[in-house]
Amino acid sequence: MEQMEVDVDMSAKPSTSSSAAAGSSMAVDKTADQNPQPQGNIMAAAGTSGSVTISLHPLVIMNISEHWTRFRAQHGEPRQVYGALIGKQKGRNIEIMNSFELKTDVIGDETVINKDYYNKKEQQYKQVFSDLDFIGWYTTGDNPTADDIKIQRQIAAINECPIMLQLNPLSRSVDHLPLKLFESLIDLVDGEATMLFVPLTYTLATEEAERIGVDHVARMTSNESGEKSVVAEHLVAQDSAIKMLNTRIKIVLQYIRDVEAGKLRANQEILREAYALCHRLPVMQVPAFQEEFYTQCNDVGLISYLGTLTKGCNDMHHFVNKFNMLYDRQGSARRMRGLYY
């Protein structure tokens, strides 16, 4: 049986056993009600090491980034977001595989997790991912704060040892991922039981579908900051080429006009090149090109028409199914009435 290890300074760290964790949680809640935690005491001592190893999937990072970006677009300013982490835990090895959003309510100056919303979302995810369990929670920001400690206490009522993941979407660093992972422990600070964060190390674990998605995202960015996509870069290059072509054509046209007006001497080599340039486009007016062009237009129109017909058939199929369902219900009702008369 696992037991809680008690140091000489009476600092206790919650173990994985349910009885020990329940006792620790009750002690933490009782102490928090009597003596609020000091604002400056958030991180554990530098020599404190984590008790678990984390394997993080890229899908979680993309979910958090999408959540924060969507909230920023909706509200017009960056806002701190919260969500739940789900995955698998085997002993001291934790694999964070997915995540979902959490609804929060602001009561006074404190943020409170909506437990009803969490329970509803957990049931929905359990129906699809029955082998995934609640691991912890995520938020956004640069460093943990006292408010994060309060959220950690709330999450501890759901999971005895929750993991906190903090992502900084505003970071410009390209050397490493702007995220941190923490677990919590209870220690005595100035004679008071205090919840502190302990940094955790992590490794990235990917599956085939995630590797394809991450590779697609990486290819769609033209620089490390991700400000321009490949499509935008391609369009910019085309725009520059068209502008340059337009400028050169205007120069050639102005030269020919000046030669006709007698302002410049005629250069036969330049005139021959201009003549050859003007006769490049009419070459495409040959009957073979026209035939292929119209054939391709007909093919495109036929494909569009087939798509419209397919959509119409699909709508008709749904309509017939609903009609048959309604007809069967009415027939059953008539048969039931016939039994009583």
UniProtKB/Swiss-Prot annotation:
Natural source organism: Drosophila melanogaster (Fruit fly)
Coiled coil: none
Gene Ontology molecular functions: identical protein binding
Protein's recorded name: COP9 signalosome complex subunit 6
Annotated ranges, domain MPN: 54-188
Further remarks about this protein from its record: Although strongly related to metalloprotease proteins, it lacks the JAMM motif that probably constitutes the catalytic center. Its function as protease is therefore unsure.
GO cellular component, one term: COP9 signalosome
Major place of residence: cytoplasm
GO biological process terms held by the UniProt record: female germ-line stem cell population maintenance; germ cell development; male germ-line cyst encapsulation; oogenesis; protein deneddylation; protein stabilization
Keyword set includes Nucleus: yes
